[in-house]
């Protein structure tokens, strides 16, 4: 076999050689010594050729993340905080996700991300829907954990903890902040029961109740946001929910690997 050895500073040529798995050796000039780069890739080579740091390389590079609303972004932040504490590999990439501050319905987001003519645009972004929808990795869509709308997940979870007299209600942080069972009864459960009666009255009189439950849940969440934040932290750390929390992490990782190259972010940042 004929072997060819040559040197180059051409980024495009190096990128092509790496893509076809050619043997690329990159030597790093460290002033007083020269050593071979371990596992060279185009991102590390570009950084060294341009005398940049990792922070310089990724300063303006982010992956757009679209969610349905502010409530979803709030819970997504809590999930990210959990993943940073639990998975060291996630710590270096969490800041690369840019949560777009816009409210778009699940139906509209799904329509955008499944539109074949927009694929070139949407494949550069990640869509995160509430848990009452399904993930669609092919179209860059992932569903939040919980298998229901976030507010519904938390309301059901609060009721479950209340009925079970869970130790959550005796946790020092919860008690010190005043979020006792009495708080739950007065500010949340009574409101839920009252709204349920109101919905029944509307249905019996022939009035439409479409969307009313969702609107009520969102208002209740925002009126008691700090309580629900603590509740969701407990939900995330509950072993009963580990499969859902881990499923979301895995699917988010898969989408990161698909989307990162479009933003000149090395997939190796999240191995």
Model-assigned labels for residue ranges:
Residues 7-10:
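H-loop/switch region of ABC-family ATPase nucleotide-binding domains
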Residues 88, 162, 166-169, 260, ...:
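Residue-level signal for secondary-structure boundary elements
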Residues 23-24, 51-60, 111-114, 142-154, ...:
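Short secondary-structure transition/capping segments
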Residues 15-124, 129-135:
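RecA-like P-loop NTPase motor core
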Residues 98-103, 142-145, 231-232, 238-239:
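Short acidic-hydrophobic, aromatic-tinged amphipathic segments that line or gate anion-handling sites
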Residues 173-271:
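Charge-biased C-terminal accessory regions appended to nucleic-acid-, cytoskeletal NTPase
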Residues 2-5, 123-124:
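Loop/turn-to-beta-strand initiation segments
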Residues 123, 129-213:
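Activity-critical C-terminal alpha-helical subdomain
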């Amino acid at each position: 076999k004929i072997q060819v050895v040559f040197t180059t500073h051409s980024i495009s040529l190096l990128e092509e050689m790496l893509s076809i798995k050619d043997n690329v050796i990159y030597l790093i000039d460290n002033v007083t010594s020269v050593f071979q780069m371990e596992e060279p890739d185009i991102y590390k080579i570009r950084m060294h050729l341009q005398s940049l740091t990792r922070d310089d390389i990724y300063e303006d590079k982010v992956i757009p993340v679209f969610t349905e609303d502010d409530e979803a972004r709030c819970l997504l932040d809590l999930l990210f905080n959990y993943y940073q504490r639990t998975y060291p590999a996630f710590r270096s990439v969490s800041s690369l996700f840019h949560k777009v501050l816009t409210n778009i319905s699940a139906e509209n987001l799904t329509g955008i991300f499944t539109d074949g003519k927009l694929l070139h645009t949407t494949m550069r972004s990640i869509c995160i829907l509430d848990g009452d929808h399904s993930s669609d990795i092919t179209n860059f869509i992932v569903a939040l954990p919980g298998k229901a709308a976030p507010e519904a997940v938390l309301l059901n979870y609060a009721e479950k903890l209340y009925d079970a007299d869970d130790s959550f209600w005796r946790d020092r942080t919860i008690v010190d902040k005043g979020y006792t069972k009495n708080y739950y009864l007065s500010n949340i459960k009574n409101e839920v029961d009252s709204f349920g009666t109101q919905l029944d009255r509307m249905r019996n009189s022939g009035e439409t109740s479409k969307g009313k439950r969702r609107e009520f849940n969102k208002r209740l969440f925002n009126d008691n946001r700090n309580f629900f934040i603590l509740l969701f932290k407990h939900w995330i750390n509950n072993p009963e929910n580990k499969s859902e929390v881990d499923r979301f992490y895995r699917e988010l990782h898969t989408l990161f690997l698909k989307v990162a190259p479009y933003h000149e972010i090395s997939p190796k940042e999240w191995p």
